[in-house]
Amino acid sequence: MVLTNVKQFASEMNLTPERLLEQLRAAGVSKRSPEDSLSAQDKSQLLDYLKRSHGAREDSGITLTRKSTSEVKKADGSTVTVETRKKRVVVRPDDAPRAEAPKPAEPAPAPAAAPAEAKPEPKPEPKVEAKPEPKPEPKPEPKVEAKPEPKPEPKPAAAPAPRTVASILSPEEIAAREAEEKRQAAFRARQEALMREKIEREERRQAAKLAASQPAPEPAPVVEPQREERRDDRRGAPSGDNRGPRGNDNRGPRPAGAGDRGPRPGGDNRGPRPAGAGDRGPRPGGDNRGPRPAGAGDRGPRPAPAAAAPSQPPAPAPGGSRPGKGKKGGERSWDDNKKGGRGLKTKGGDAGNDWKSRGGKGRNKQNNQHAFQAPTEPIVHEVLVPETITVAELAHKMAVKAVEVIKTLMKMGMMVTINQVLDQETALIVVEEMGHIGKAAQADDPEAYLDVTDGETVEVVEQPRSPVVTVMGHVDHGKTSLLDYIRRAKVAAGEAGGITQHIGAYHVETPRGMITFLDTPGHEAFTAMRARGAKATDIVVLVVAADDGVMPQTIEAIHHAKAAKVPMVVAVNKIDKQGANVERIRQELVAHEVVPEDWGGDTQFVEVSAKMGLNIDALLEAILLQAEVLELKAPVDSLAKGIIVEARLDKGRGPVATLLVQSGTLKKGDVVLAGTAFGRVRAMMDENGKAIDSAGPAIPVEILGLSDVPQAGEDAMALADEKKAREIALFRAGKFRDVRLAKQQAAKLENMFAQMAEGEVQTLSIIIKADVQGSYEALAGSLQKLSTEEVRVAILHSGVGGISESDVNLAIASKAIVIGFNTRADAAARKLAENEGVDIRYYNIIYDAVDEVKAALSGMLAPEKKEQILGTVEIRQVITVSKVGNIAGCMVTDGMIKRSASIRLIRNHVVIHTGELESLKRFKDDVKEVKQGYECGLMLKNFNDIQEGDQLEAFEIVEVARSL
């Protein structure tokens, strides 16, 4: 029998060992530590306890599975075996569901309780023939009263949810969900209260108007009997009103009369109704029930009596034409049914205000002229707008039709489609235009997701941590030698050759504490890290050679440290060499506002020798002293946060990232998010390549398991939810891709006219593959700085890892050069490159790559043309030959003259003509050149105006290669 311990079983069940121990104790299994073993009996006992606690029950069904095999013959004579599987579930009859069946009927009397109380009131109902009241009247009434009721109903349904998911969600998450539901319920209740208050205010205002001007409804009795007859003939409805009780508002029976039904004699005090059964006006009394919903008769809002009384026309003759039907629907328009609401169109009354009424549409317009309109104020939504959103998604968030959003955008001058993507700024303007509240959503901010667990992390006690030190300085000032000596002196003997295991950061144990040294790829990477606001470096050690002094890169390092507001410790190296002048270095550093403590400043100066090992302990002591002043602290028992120092692509292990933990503890199995890369930590190693399970603050580690190679200097953090990490990473990748494409498009548009004006720019396309991410970044930046107005370097692709066949194919398509920095091409890539003639160059030093690319760009520059004077010729005799022209007999007085040279004719020190030679002869022979002191005969091309004494200057145009 295989035994497992509590810790292993907890990891299988996705529980913490402490939680599993609590459940085991509650089940009666005595286990004290996560290392205790668990038997099958213990697991069975725990399972029985969990079933009892969660209310498990026996299966009430039997599953029958039937399988049959048959063969089907095809046309070609072959057979195909067909297997048919049938599955049937037989449910065992159970008494429990029958007993529980009547329970859902209990809430039913609740909504009917209100009408039940009003049953004694409508007893005099048979005396009154309320024929104008259509039967659909009870339908709108429950709609108004039932609107708020379904909203509280989900609350009891949500009660059992914590019991069913208690084993999955923590109590804090359940409490957060319940708080969110309460907040939503309060928000809905507040909106309903505001709407009711608005309706009541409108009704009170309308009631005041009705009370001020209340005409006598005299024409009503004349019209109503005929309407009664027509309605009865049309509907065939019984004369009695069998609609049942109206509610608990203590209204008395209605008097006879279909149109003007008069005041209710009950205690309703609502004043007289206006004429017209189909379109009943508002209740002028104190009945604050809100507007009637459009029912079967499409009665809509009740108009004011002042408008209703004059609008009654004389009764039409039985056989005569009805008003409003003289033309073929001539009175109808698009606005006919707008004022009566958008209810269901059914057969209405004859009062002239229904869509099928016989009174014509003209009266309908008069009736509704001063009618009370139902409040149409929309519910204000709080819309979270991401960085990009489509028109359809934006309309869905505002609970409106997409057509309305498109109309709003058209008013703003934008012609869009329903699937067009809007940017965040435009979407926020649209939301505000449509009367809603727009807020910019921070969907890609992990801090917003971690706000839920802030209550846990705030209480974590911060503990002192070791300092993170960056060593900076000029190239040849002994920075690397100093780091090597510190590792050799303070690390175990077996790690003496640990420089080859370079991961960019390592920590050193000293008698007074631990120090983490950070070796950034260069100053630019250091600035980029500081610009992101990540406090990766606590102290900067500035290395200055005593025999060389302050150099440009030293000054640059000082500026970086001051911009980041990081304290400095100056290490004056090479003090054992002759010619070392420490005092001169102090004076030069003071000129750059780095004042030593001896001179009243705040910067420690330590004189060291990396070669001899002098004062190395004093340097470490100064670093730890500065760290004590800073009081560096960080939480330990929380999710880890850190920064990516370096990243590379390992052929066997995939993406490998060097992570410097800044706060919290990173454990094996945590989900890490770094920019657009995410993944679960499959393995962790320290700087010596040893596998570790956890790393605390200020500890550098190599992690494996990320989905892609992250950017150097990117912030990294551990998340509790892998799904959320994937969502954020994919969102960032899509956003970065959109931004990159937008930038490229903008650059094309901006540079289009400039390139057309300046002519075509020569472009050198390059593909860079490097060993680590920092290397190709530095190389790409250095090469792009070589671009000028005439030649340009285009980095088509850059990445980490070896040169693959896909890289060579890209180079073939784009006619690019492939540069491998500390990498090599595989066999397939080499063979393809040889066959296609792709140039692959390998470099180990960045300066060699920059120099060769610079030389290639220089060759692409247009050569510079210069004029080189060859010699001077004096014309001593002019011979005229018919059909040939003038021939000059000359003497070469200086230099030489060539047959291919250009000629400049000078007369009286003035240039008369510039051209070419047509022929050059010495005696009767054609010659290519004539040197100084010899005579020759020559003839100019297309020019005969030559005289004795003229000077001829021979010159040629020479192209001189340019360089960057």
Curated annotation (Swiss-Prot):
Keywords: Cytoplasm, GTP-binding, Initiation factor, Nucleotide-binding, Protein biosynthesis
Localization per Swiss-Prot or TrEMBL: Cytoplasm
Disordered as annotated region, ranges: 26-375
Region of interest (G5), residue spans: 609-611
GO cellular component terms, A-Z: cytosol
Renumbered residue ranges of the record's region G3: 519-522
Comp. bias intervals (Basic and acidic residues): 49-60, 91-103, 118-154, 174-206, 225-236, 243-252, 328-339
The tr-type G domain, residue ranges: 464-633
Pfam (any one): IF2_assoc
Binding site for GTP: 473-480, 519-523, 573-576
G4: annotated span: 573-576
CDD domains: IF2_eIF5B (cd01887), IF2_mtIF2_II (cd03702), mtIF2_IVc (cd03692)
Region G2, residue ranges: 498-502
GO molecular function: GTP binding; GTPase activity; translation initiation factor activity
Positions of the UniProt region annotated as G1: 473-480
Family note: Belongs to the TRAFAC class translation factor GTPase superfamily. Classic translation factor GTPase family. IF-2 subfamily.
Function: One of the essential components for the initiation of protein synthesis. Protects formylmethionyl-tRNA from spontaneous hydrolysis and promotes its binding to the 30S ribosomal subunits. Also involved in the hydrolysis of GTP during the formation of the 70S ribosomal complex.
Protein name: Translation initiation factor IF-2
Source organism phylogeny: Bacteria, Pseudomonadati, Pseudomonadota, Betaproteobacteria, Neisseriales
Gene assigned in the entry: infB
